Amino acid sequence: MEVDKSLIAFLEMLDTAMAQRMLADLANDEKRTPQLYNAINKLLDRHKFQIGKLQPDVHILGGLAGALEEYKEKVGDNGLTDDDIYTLQ
């Protein structure tokens, strides 16, 4: 069965437009209601949104994403460099 890519593209655009409007509504005190939060939660659930899986967006964060990668390369799983470990001993 062949997937209709035009339908997928349409649904992605629709979902994106809806998410953008929800985000704009969050800034409006009158529109920021429990129903809005519920709709946002449903959107996030539908996309199986998990904060732990997010990756930094280079276009938004600029050099911060690169700095994060450099930091990860220099420190161990405990967040310490070799110099830090030596100093603590």
From Swiss-Prot:
Domain of life the protein comes from: Viruses
InterPro entries the record matches: DNA_matur_Phage_T7-like (IPR024345)
Pfam families: DNA_Packaging_2
Key words, A-Z: Viral genome packaging, Viral release from host cell
Function: During the growth of this phage, DNA is synthesized as concatemers. During DNA packaging mature monomers are cut from the concatemers.
Subunit structure: Gp18 and gp19 associate with DNA and prohead.
Name of this protein: DNA maturase A
Organism name: Enterobacteria phage T3
Lineage: Viruses, Duplodnaviria, Heunggongvirae, Uroviricota, Caudoviricetes
